[in-house]
Structures are given as structure tokens and as C-alpha cells.
């Protein structure tokens, strides 16, 4: 049976983690019901992350998702095929962030010039309050073709030709990125040599092919602050950033590291609002004390956390 949908409140935001099931309309009926009960709606969804068991799951899922958003642009999205889902009977493992109705936030698409596949129907960038959500970016040109090849070249293209212009159009900047998630199906060392190192970043080594543009080897999504929030953004030990109570943490190896970061931010691990455990076959699994999921990837163990510091 699919796991029940648990929505965790963090100030003006709701987090759903590890929403699993078939790639069907029923999945979104469950999500919509949970959002309504929690004081939100599909129209307030700010971001979606989808992990699939295989590529055959993508078309039915995207069709169901498009229908669920009822003609509106789908929230910024990242889709990755992983080696194995936590629930082997499921076709998709979904993560969602939404604003509460009480926040007054109305998601607004930002005209960044970024493209996306027509079948996916998602908005490449949304502004919700003073947060900017940029969908997963590949090294594609305006025609949708891959414009760079190899991990280092793709990374540089994504940063210089996709992220920097998009953030500028959204009245943000690279140094206002709160968190980046990076999926690499090649050599992660090449990525690190081409990536701006001062940003909280989670690097996940995935199988190849892993992306809907199958020859691509790097996909990057980011959450950034609008420039009006710069004065409220706080760096935490160079490994996390804090804005208005939301704690954005870069990828970690252990929960001991996480405890130190949360303590430095003025909170503790009881305020984890999302934990993603990426692990090689036979390695770490999800921690039951957190809203979490576990996803099998190519190698290693990477812990990706989001937290809350009560104001």
C-alpha cells in the first residue's frame, strides 16, 4: 500500500516527502485532498521533485500531473530515474513544497527565457513570496538540444547559460542561491571542478541514463532568495543557509554532521522537515524519526536535509 501523505508545516510552507504510488490520477487526488485538509491547494504548489523506477513511468505520470494542475502551469519540476525506489511496488516517489493559504503567497511564473519539454508543462521558474524555485536544468540550448557534452562542460553551460540569466531575470543572483541539488551520471569530481563552491549543494551520483534527455549527464535545480531578502539571509558554517525560518542544508555524509549544523542554526534534528537518503545498494536507509524517503543510486550515501528554525 502507498504510504499516507504526511504534510509537515514549516511557517508558511508545507513539505510532503516520499509520496509513493502508481503514476496515475489517483496519486494527485490523494495529494490534493491532503493539501486541502492542511490549508493549501494545488495552485499553491511551489516545487515538485519526482524519482521514477524507470522511463516507462514518466508519460503516464506527466499526463496525470498536467491534469491535476487543471490547465495551470505545473510547478517547477525535477525528474530523475534512480536505481530503485524505497517501495518497489511504486512507480514514482514524489516530493512537494507548497505555500499555505494563510501565507497570502500566490505563485507567480517568472519570465526567465528558460525552455522545457512541451510534454512536461511545468513552469521553469516560480516566485513564491521571496523565494524563487528554478526547475531542474540541463545543458540544453533554446531548441532543446544538448549544447554541451561531458560533466564539466555541461555544468559550466548550466551555470553560465541557464542559472545565472534566469536568476538575474528573477531579480536574484548566484550568491543568493539557498540550496542546489545536482544529479550527476558521470564523474562527480568533474562537476565539483566546474561548480561555484560556496553554495549549499547536494551532489547525487545517479545511473546513466537518468534524465529525460538521456544523453545528458548533469541536472541542477535551485532555490534562491529574491534580492529583497538578502539582508535576512544567514550563512551557517558555510554548509547551510537560513531564511525566514527555513534551513537549507547542503548534502551530508552523516547525521552527526547534520546535528552540528542544526545546532549552529539554533534548532535541532527534531525540526527536520524533509530528509532524502540517497544510498548505494545495501547501504543506508531512511531514518524513521524524520519525514523521509530513501532512493537507491549509483554509489555512496548522501543525506539531503531541509529544516525549520521556529521564529
Q: Could you describe each region identified by the protein language model?
A:
Residues 1-311:
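N-terminal presequence-like segments and the immediate start of the first folded domain
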Amino acid at each position: 500500500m502507498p504510504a499516507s501523505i504526511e504534510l509537515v508545516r514549516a511557517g508558511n510552507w508545507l513539505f510532503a516527502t516520499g509520496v509513493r504510488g502508481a503514476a496515475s490520477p489517483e496519486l494527485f487526488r490523494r495529494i490534493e485532498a491532503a493539501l486541502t485538509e492542511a490549508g493549501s491547494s494545488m495552485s499553491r504548489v511551489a516545487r515538485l521533485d519526482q524519482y521514477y523506477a524507470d522511463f516507462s513511468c514518466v508519460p503516464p505520470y506527466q499526463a496525470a500531473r498536467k491534469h491535476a494542475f487543471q490547465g495551470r502551469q505545473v510547478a517547477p519540476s525535477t525528474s530523475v530515474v534512480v536505481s530503485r525506489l524505497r517501495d518497489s511496488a511504486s512507480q514514482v516517489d514524489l516530493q512537494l513544497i507548497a505555500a499555505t493559504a494563510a501565507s497570502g503567497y500566490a505563485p507567480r511564473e517568472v519570465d526567465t527565457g528558460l525552455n522545457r519539454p512541451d510534454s512536461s508543462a511545468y513552469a521553469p521558474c516560480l516566485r513564491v513570496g521571496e523565494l524563487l524555485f528554478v526547475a531542474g536544468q540541463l545543458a540544453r540550448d533554446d531548441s532543446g538540444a544538448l549544447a554541451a557534452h561531458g560533466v564539466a562542460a555541461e555544468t559550466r553551460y548550466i551555470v553560465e547559460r541557464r542559472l545565472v540569466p534566469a536568476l538575474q531575470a528573477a531579480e536574484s543572483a548566484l550568491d543568493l542561491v539557498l540550496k542546489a541539488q545536482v544529479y550527476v551520471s558521470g564523474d562527480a569530481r568533474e562537476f565539483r571542478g566546474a561548480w561555484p563552491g560556496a553554495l549549499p549543494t547536494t551532489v547525487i551520483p545517479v545511473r546513466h541514463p537518468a534524465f529525460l534527455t538521456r544523453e545528458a549527464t548533469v541536472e541542477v535545480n535551485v532555490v534562491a532568495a529574491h534580492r529583497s531578502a538578502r539582508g535576512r539571509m544567514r550563512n551557517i558554517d558555510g554548509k547551510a543557509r537560513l531564511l525566514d525560518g527555513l534551513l537549507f542544508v547542503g548534502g551530508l555524509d552523516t547525521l552527526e554532521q547534520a546535528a552540528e549544523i542544526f545546532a549552529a542554526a539554533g534548532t535541532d534534528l527534531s525540526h527536520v522537515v524533509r530528509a532524502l537518503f540517497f544510498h548505494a545498494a545495501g547501504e543506508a536507509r531512511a531514518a524513521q524519526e524524520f519525514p523521509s524517503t530513501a532512493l537507491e543510486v549509483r554509489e555512496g550515501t548522501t543525506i539531503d536535509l531541509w529544516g525549520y528554525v521556529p521564529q
